[in-house]
C-alpha cells in the first residue's frame, strides 16, 4: 500500500463526485471542445428507455379495463394534451408540439430520477469496471449545466422555427424591430426604436433560454449536493464509535430527503415542459 494513501476528506469526496467523465481535461470554465461523456451516455440511455416505456404502453393498450400502467400513462398523456391545447392554439402545430412536450417531460423526469440512486453506487461500479479507483462518473445529466442549456437552446431554436413558419421570415423580422415599443413615421425615431426593440428582443430570448436551463440545473445540482452530504453522514458514522445516533440520523435524513426529492424531480420536469409549451405558444402570437 502506498505511504500517501489516505481516506478522502469531505471536500475531496464532494469534488471527486462533481467531476465528469470527459473526452479531454477541461482547461477553462467555457471550453466547447470538452464533452461530458457521462451526461451524454446516461441521457441517451434514458431517452431510449423512455421511448421504450411509451411504446410498451401503446403496444399493450386495450379498449377494455385498463391496467394500472396503462391508466397512469393515459393520465399523463391527457395532462400534457390539455396543457398543449391551453398554450398552443394552432391545431396543426400541436400535432408535433404535444408529443414533444410529452417526450420532454418523460425524458427529464427519468434524468432527474437518477438522483434517487445511492450516490456511490454507479461511480463505484464504474471504477470496478475500469480498474481505476479514481475514475470519474456523474449519473444525473440534469445536474450538468451543458445538458440543461442544451435542452433550453433546442427550445429556443424551435421558437425561431415556429416564428418563421407562422409569421413568415419578413413578419418575424418586422416584429423583432417593432416590438415591444412600436415604431415611428419619423425615419430617425424609427431607426432608434428599431435598434432598441431589437436589443430588447435579443435580451428577452437570451434571458428566457438561460433561465430555462439554469432553473432545472440549479435545483438538481443542489439536490445532488444534499445527497452527497447525507452520504458523508453515513461515512462519518462508519468511522465513529461515539456517534451512535449518527447512522440513525443518516437513514432518517436520507429517507426524508428522498421522499421530498421525488416531488422536486417531478415538479422540475413539469416546469420545464410547461415553459417549453409557453415559449412555443408565444412564438405563434403576434406582438
Curated annotation (Swiss-Prot):
InterPro entries: ATP_syn_F0_a_bact/chloroplast, ATP_synth_F0_asu, ATP_synth_F0_asu_AS, F0_ATP_A_sf. One of its GO terms (biological process) is proton motive force-driven plasma membrane ATP synthesis. It is found in: Cell inner membrane. It is a multi-pass membrane protein. CDD domains: ATP-synt_Fo_a_6. The chain crosses the membrane at residues 37-57, 96-116, 149-169, 187-207, 224-244, 266-286. SUPFAM superfamilies: F1F0 ATP synthase subunit A. The keyword Ion transport applies. One of its GO terms (cellular component) is proton-transporting ATP synthase complex. Key component of the proton channel; it plays a direct role in the translocation of protons across the membrane. Belongs to the ATPase A chain family. F-type ATPases have 2 components, CF(1) - the catalytic core - and CF(0) - the membrane proton channel. CF(1) has five subunits: alpha(3), beta(3), gamma(1), delta(1), epsilon(1). CF(0) has three main subunits: a(1), b(2) and c(9-12). The alpha and beta chains form an alternating ring which encloses part of the gamma chain. CF(1) is attached to CF(0) by a central stalk formed by the gamma and epsilon chains, while a peripheral stalk is formed by the delta and b chains. This is ATP synthase subunit a.
Amino acid at each position: 500500500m502506498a505511504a500517501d494513501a489516505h481516506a478522502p476528506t469531505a471536500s475531496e469526496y464532494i469534488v471527486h463526485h462533481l467531476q465528469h467523465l470527459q473526452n479531454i481535461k477541461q482547461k477553462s470554465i467555457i471550453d466547447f471542445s470538452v464533452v461530458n461523456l457521462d451526461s451524454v451516455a446516461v441521457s441517451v440511455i434514458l431517452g431510449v428507455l423512455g421511448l421504450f416505456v411509451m411504446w410498451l404502453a401503446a403496444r399493450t393498450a386495450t379498449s377494455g379495463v385498463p391496467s394500472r400502467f396503462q391508466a397512469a400513462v393515459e393520465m399523463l398523456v391527457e395532462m400534457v394534451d390539455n396543457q398543449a391545447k391551453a398554450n398552443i392554439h394552432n391545431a396543426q402545430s400541436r400535432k408535433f408540439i404535444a408529443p414533444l412536450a410529452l417526450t420532454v417531460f418523460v425524458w427529464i423526469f427519468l434524468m432527474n430520477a437518477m438522483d434517487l440512486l445511492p450516490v456511490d453506487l454507479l461511480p463505484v461500479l464504474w471504477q470496478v469496471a475500469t480498474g481505476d479507483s479514481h475514475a470519474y462518473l456523474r449519473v444525473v445529466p440534469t445536474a450538468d449545466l451543458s445538458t440543461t442549456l442544451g435542452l433550453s437552446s433546442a427550445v429556443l431554436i424551435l421558437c425561431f422555427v415556429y416564428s418563421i413558419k407562422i409569421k413568415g421570415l419578413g413578419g418575424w423580422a418586422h416584429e423583432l424591430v417593432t416590438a415591444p415599443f412600436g415604431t415611428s413615421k419619423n425615419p430617425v425615431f424609427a431607426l432608434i426604436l428599431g435598434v432598441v426593440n431589437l436589443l430588447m428582443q435579443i435580451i428577452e430570448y437570451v434571458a428566457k433560454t438561460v433561465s430555462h436551463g439554469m432553473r432545472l440545473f440549479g435545483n438538481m445540482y443542489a439536490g445532488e449536493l444534499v445527497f452527497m452530504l447525507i452520504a458523508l453522514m453515513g461515512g462519518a458514522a462508519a468511522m465513529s464509535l461515539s456517534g451512535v445516533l449518527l447512522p440513525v440520523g443518516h437513514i432518517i435524513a436520507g429517507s426524508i430527503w428522498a421522499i421530498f426529492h421525488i416531488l422536486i424531480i417531478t415538479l422540475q420536469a413539469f416546469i420545464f415542459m410547461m415553459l417549453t409549451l409557453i415559449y412555443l405558444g408565444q412564438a405563434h402570437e403576434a406582438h
